Amino acid sequence: MNIQIFGTKKCNDTKKAERFFKERGIKYQFINMKEKGMSKGEFVSVAQANGGLENMINWEGKDQDTLAIIKYIADEDKLEKVLENPQVIKTPVVRNGKQSTLGYQPDVWKRWN
């Protein structure tokens, strides 16, 4: 397995995801989205695997001003705006090769080989 966890250090679900893999002795790479974020290619790949751009956005997040802009701008501009503002992406984003999840989903991770 080649696990990557994209999240923030303050996110409780990200901490729980890290604990899940640590407890099972599974190595993972943590990417702090406040420092690095996701590349456009990574984001598009994860979005496709999880039902599209709209599902990637945490609409209940703290940054309501940015979320309002994303909600009402043209569809072709949304991707760039989300990539510029990684704080609006649901976390954790957990990747294992081409598979990925949004949020804390241990039942899915248990099935990964």
Role assignments for model-derived ranges:
Residues 1-24, 28-33:
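Local sequence-structure signature of Cys/Sec-based thiol-disulfide redox active-site neighborhoods
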Residues 33-113:
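Thiol/selenol-based redox catalytic cores and closely related redox-interacting motifs
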